[in-house]
A protein has these predicted regions:
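Alpha-helical multipass membrane-protein architecture
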Residues: 2-878
Length: 878
């Protein structure tokens, strides 16, 4: 028996008896004795025909010889012989039920599940029996998803004795959290943002961790039998690095409180004390954490919650720390990573500095630069960007295009293309006077086609001034913005009605569990059960990853509930104590919205890679509920949006830990510590910038630190909190209020059609993804969506279908390498040639900004109108 086979046997946790109805669970000792009595057969014992058939089952059409087999084939070859026909058929029946409407399972594979579960198998047909057993073993002991198999070894290979929560892991995590969180906070307020990503951190953690393990002495002390030491007598492991990466990564996203603090300080002139900043940040930072515990059962434990856009983190971790078979042909993952990283580190200089036309490749406008219609339709600067070859810049293409499922990317693009066509139709028919404005601008405009200056309708204390408003102008949207807002409004009711129809059983069970749990808390027994650390929440999940994770102590629900309850109490006190003019019921309303939307949004992201926030929904609802109160709107928006954003960030980390077998309690402690420390780092950066950077958040700021994100946040607070959605929906753009009804009716239509006429739709088609694609809006035209589509087609469709072996080995590693190379190159470019601007003045840098595309002129000239403006007359504005 080989080392791998012996380890697989020892680590297995469940053996199923010959009878499919009599499942017996054995201890690890029993399992070891069984396998020693019946040794696992090596792949070499199979005939060439059987091995080729196994390759065919796993879709390895690109394997041309049997001397270079993928690891999955080797693994399955040691397991197929031990499973019975009866057990295999039982697994097929469970797969048919579980993977129904699973978009990440191909129709061909699902039909195989159905065929075996309904027709059975002829025991005399050795080929069919072999295929049945291979599929069953794949489901029982590995994963049916190539994406997961590409980055995760078989779960039974896990070694739970590997140390994870070490001093050196926490030391590196704190150091990198300070640097990454501070850097990302600073550069998030720059005109062109730069952000350190987890792939960059991983790349540096590897030499730091291995060096520490090799050279730092193992000095330490014992406390009650537990050893605390600077170092341990063990190499730096992949589990340690993954633990370290995960607790750092939750601190590298958007620190949403900064929007509130900077808007209040800079635009509203408020004196914001550090106490207020800290307690508000604490609430916003941890409220999503409490909800993450609820989401675990829906988007962490289930196998179908793949989280495709997060898998490159695991791939890079394995490439750096898991040795590969030296007999495999081609580059190792380690070599491929650094080769791709070096290439992108150099290449980024061309679209970012040397040859900027590669970034905005509006080549069709170069043919006729003064053709206004050509620039409007195909341009990438001010046009809608219908261009088949729009960019060669990886910052535009993005590593997500290598990870997003093809069905998801294509469906989104179809929605984006449709909304661009609607935008063009609205513009050229002058719908709502949009022809007097640029077609695709994210600015607000006056009735004289000038950029709207929000401060002109505010009093000295930043409140809405109706007299000034009547003299100035209502705000008007460009065609692109108008269609985008309509799509946003329709998406929320569509999503709820569609998912309630398609998955009403799951949602009923989820909400029933919520309310029953809360109701049962009136009993003493419920509190005792809630505090029970031995609750086995994974017992109901039978996939191999969940069975392997059952060996670790799970975080009990009461840990998450405690965080949630404490943070809500602190939030109420903060809102009241600091006189924010925000009613407490508004806080609970925002929590309620997340209570309704959080599960479908998380499931959408976990299965398709598509994300959607609640910021616009919160803005509109709170604008109606709290008219003329922009400060309250900003606070409730921060709570309402960040609950979902933070919860998704936490549970995606939990899923990666689930894949990599990182102890849940260790991750919980690490996440809590890092999220708390991050508050001080980000607040320190924010306040330092305001006090020490001359012109920070103004057009005169050096290094382009003009805070466009804060400007947008401020504008939204005035438009939705000061002016209010009632004026916009009822009078300026009445069509927008009907988008709620349109979304609801379309949700019912598509939900019923998919539910009762599913045979007419492909399994992967999800109309919610189509609507999310329709949320494309200025300033990002179709040119930002076409290059990712082409790259996704090449990676997720062509390579995955015809070169699966190479795709599994390199795809996610290259995605991580390109991301790391891009970020580091952007940092070098900024400090070397952009902070103190240096330019190369030549055709390749100038041509994108010559001609009509750069001008952004409207179809109609407001000066040609008799009144010199459009819409209602001054003094009669809605």
């Amino acid at each position: 028996m080989s080392d791998i086979e012996e380890k697989a046997a020892i680590n297995s946790t469940e053996v199923v008896s010959k009878s499919s109805e009599d499942k017996i669970t054995f201890s690890e000792k029993d399992v070891q004795e069984i396998y020693e009595a019946q040794p696992i057969t090596s792949i070499k014992s199979y005939s060439d025909q059987q091995v080729w058939h196994l390759l065919k089952i796993l879709k390895y059409d690109d394997v041309d010889n049997l001397d270079d087999l993928p690891g999955e084939v080797e693994f399955l070859g040691t397991r197929v012989h031990e499973i019975t026909i009866e057990e295999s058929l039982e697994i097929m029946k469970e797969a048919v039920e579980y993977h129904d409407n699973d978009p990440n399972i191909s129709a061909e594979q699902y039909e195989e599940f159905i065929r075996y579960s309904t027709e059975g198998v002829d025991p005399e047909n050795e080929v069919d029996v072999f295929e049945l057993k291979a599929l069953a073993v794949l489901l029982r002991d590995h994963s049916p998803y190539p994406e997961v198999r590409a980055v995760c070894p078989p779960p039974m290979m896990d070694d739970p004795t590997i140390p994870i929560e070490t001093f050196r892991a926490y030391f590196f995590a704190i150091i990198w959290m300070i640097f990454a969180a501070g850097f990302n906070e600073l550069f998030s307020h720059r005109m062109v943002t730069i952000a350190i990503t987890s792939s960059v951190v991983q790349m540096f953690l590897y030499p730091m961790g291995t060096g520490w393990a090799k050279w730092v002495p193992c000095w330490g002390f014992n406390v009650r039998g537990k050893r605390f030491a600077l170092n341990i007598d063990s190499p730096w492991t992949d589990k340690e690095q993954m633990f370290c990466t995960l607790i750092i990564s939750i601190c590298m996203g958007t620190f949403y409180t900064s929007y509130n603090i900077l808007t209040q300080k800079i635009y509203y002139g408020s004196k914001v004390s550090f106490n207020y900043q800290f307690w508000l940040s604490l609430c916003i930072q941890f409220l999503g954490f409490g909800f993450a515990g609820i989401l675990r059962r829906f988007v962490v434990y289930p196998a179908k919650a793949v989280w495709p856009t997060s898998l490159s983190t695991i791939a890079l971790n394995r490439a750096l720390l898991t040795p590969e078979d030296p007999n495999l042909k081609g580059l190792t993952r380690y070599q491929a990573f650094f080769l791709a990283f070096g290439f992108m580190l150099v290449y980024t200089w061309f679209p970012s500095f040397i040859f900027q036309a590669l970034s905005t490749f509006n080549w069709m406008t170069w043919i006729a630069p003064n053709n206004w219609k050509l620039a409007t339709i195909t341009g990438g600067v001010s046009g809608v960007g219908i261009n088949p070859i729009a960019s060669f810049d990886w910052a535009v293409i993005g590593s997500t295009s290598l990870m997003m499922p093809w069905f998801s990317q294509a469906t989104q693009y179809a929605g984006s293309f449709l909304v661009i066509l609607i935008c063009i139709a609205c513009y050229f028919t002058n719908y709502q006077n949009t022809s007097y404005l640029p077609i695709y601008s994210n600015s607000l405009f006056t009735n004289q086609a000038e950029v709207y200056k929000v401060d002109k309708i505010l009093t000295a204390d930043y409140k809405f001034d109706n007299d000034a408003y009547q003299k100035y102008s209502p705000p008007f949207y460009s065609a692109g913005n108008l269609v985008c807002y309509g799509s946003f409004i329709a998406t929320y009711p569509f999503m709820i009605t569609y998912y309630l129809i398609m998955d009403h059983t799951m949602f009923y069970a989820a909400f029933k569990e919520y309310f029953v749990t809360i109701w049962e808390l009136r009993k003493k027994e419920a509190w005792v059960s809630l505090w029970n650390d031995d609750a086995r929440v994974l017992d109901q999940f039978k996939d191999p990853h969940s069975r392997a994770m059952a060996r670790y102590r799970e975080v009990p629900d009461w840990w998450y509930f405690s965080v949630l309850i404490v943070v809500i109490i602190i939030a109420v006190i903060t809102i009241e104590e600091f006189h924010t003019n925000t009613p407490v019921w508004a806080l609970f309303m925002s929590i309620g919205f997340n209570f309704v939307f959080l599960i479908p949004l998380a499931i959408l992201q976990a299965t398709t890679g598509v994300s959607l926030g609640l910021n616009l929904l919160i803005e509109m609802i709170m604008g109606y509920a709290l008219p003329g109160n922009p400060m309250a709107l900003m606070i409730i928006k921060a709570f309402g949006y960040n609950i979902d954003g933070q919860a998704d960030s936490y549970v995606s980390n939990l899923k990666l830990a689930h894949y990599c077998k990182v102890a849940p309690r260790a991750l919980f402690r690490g996440q809590m510590i890092m999220a708390f420390l991050q508050i001080f780092i980000n607040l320190g950066v924010i306040n330092w910038c305001v006090d020490n950077m001359k012109g920070f958040c103004t057009p005169e700021a050096k290094g382009k630190f003009t805070c466009p994100d804060i400007q947008t946040y401020y504008n939204a607070s005035v438009m939705w909190g000061g002016l209010g959605p009632k004026k916009i929906f009822n009078d300026v753009y009445p069509i927008l209020k009907w988008c709620w009804l349109i979304g609801f009716l379309l949700g019912v239509l598509f939900g019923c059609a998919k539910k009762f006429g599913g045979k007419y739709f492909p399994v992967w088609f999800n109309p919610v993804i189509f609507l999310v694609g329709m949320l494309i809006g200025p300033p990002y035209g179709l040119m930002y969506y076409t290059p990712p589509l082409l790259m996704c087609f090449f990676s997720q469709w062509y390579c995955k279908r015809y070169h699966l072996k190479l795709w599994e080995r390199y795809n996610y590693v290259i995605a991580a390498a390109f991301n790391a190379g891009l970020v580091l190159s952007q940092i070098i470019i900024f400090f070397s040639v952009q902070y103190n601007p240096k330019e190369i003045n030549w055709w390749g840098n100038n041509v994108p900004y010559l001609g009509q595309d750069a001008e952004g002129l409207p179809l109609k000239n407001i000066a040609d109108t008799a009144k010199g403006y459009f819409g209602p007359a001054p003094g009669h504005y809605p």
